[in-house]
């Protein structure tokens, strides 16, 4: 039986109309696939093996990547679930040398401020094993920068604003899928979050209704790329199972 929903303000109904799922357009769940248990395990094993190879890279090759690869990865990101299906994200793909240079210059201003004044000693100590500093040459070396924006609200054709629900969570989900898709294609990424990032709105011409979420650096790793010798937590350290 399909549950009904009565719209109320406090204890008083706004309307007598009761809404059910059948009141809205629906379509059959055509593309769902169920796999036999052994195949399910095998598929997950291969997926885990592949995704566990993903590493954050800070040394990129300037080798070009065909744009259609980036477009397909972005299409995958666009399938992410979102609050009320409002899809509150916008991706700006930057490949032009002039714009990448502007972004690097603005980002390094904020990064120098961070490392010299804003960051606490504890924060700097946490970053030390990663070997990061205020110099960000990868912002110009990598073939693509993808600036991810979250939209706090949308606009109807008549100019009215539409509130977006859970834009941070929704954009985070879409970005996670994007990173995974790019890794699956054989590309490396770096999530870069200089703070504040308002300069991205100015350089990329995005409206105030959009907030920079992060800057994704995308490309092939340099031939001699090195990454920090760090490890990931085992399952038992970040998971709890409750079966009663």
Model-derived regions, located:
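C-terminal helix-cap and adjacent tail motif
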Residues: 15-43, 133, 214-244
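N-terminal accessory segments that position/regulate proteins before the catalytic core
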Residues: 5-57, 61-71, 117
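Glycine/small-residue-rich phosphate/adenosyl-binding loop
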Residues: 20, 93-171
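Glycine-rich phosphate/pyrophosphate-binding beta-alpha loops
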Residues: 78-84
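Small-aliphatic-rich amphipathic alpha-helix that forms the alpha element of a beta-alpha
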Residues: 73-77, 146, 152-203
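Short, electropositive alpha-helical surface patch
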Residues: 200-213
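Short loop-to-beta-strand entry elements in the cores of soluble alpha/beta enzymes
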Residues: 84-95
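Glycine-rich, charged/polar anion/phosphate-binding loops
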Residues: 76-78, 129-134, 200-202, 225
């Amino acid at each position: 039986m399909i549950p009904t929903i009565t719209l109320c303000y406090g204890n008083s109904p706004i309307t007598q109309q009761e809404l059910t799922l059948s009141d809205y357009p629906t379509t059959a769940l055509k593309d769902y696939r169920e796999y036999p248990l052994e195949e399910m395990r095998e598929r997950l094993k291969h997926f885990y093996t592949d995704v566990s190879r993903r590493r954050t890279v800070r040394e990129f090759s300037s080798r070009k990547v065909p744009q259609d690869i980036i477009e397909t990865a972005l299409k995958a990101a666009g399938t992410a679930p979102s609050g009320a299906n409002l899809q509150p994200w916008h991706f700006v793909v930057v490949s032009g040398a002039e714009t990448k240079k502007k972004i690097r210059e603005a980002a390094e201003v904020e990064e120098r401020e961070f490392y010299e004044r804003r960051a606490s000693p504890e924060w700097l100590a946490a970053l030390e094993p990663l070997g990061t500093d205020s110099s960000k040459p990868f912002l110009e070396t990598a073939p693509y920068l993808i600036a991810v924006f979250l939209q706090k609200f949308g606009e109807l054709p008549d100019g009215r604003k539409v509130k977006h629900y859970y834009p941070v969570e929704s954009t985070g989900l879409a970005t996670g899928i994007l990173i995974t898709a790019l890794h699956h294609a054989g590309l490396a990424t770096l999530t870069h979050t200089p703070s504040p990032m308002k300069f991205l709105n100015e350089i990329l011409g995005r409206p105030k209704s959009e907030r920079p979420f992060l800057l994704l650096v995308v490309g092939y790793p340099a031939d001699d790329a090195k990454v920090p010798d760090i490890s990931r937590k085992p399952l038992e350290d970040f998971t709890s199972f409750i079966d009663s």
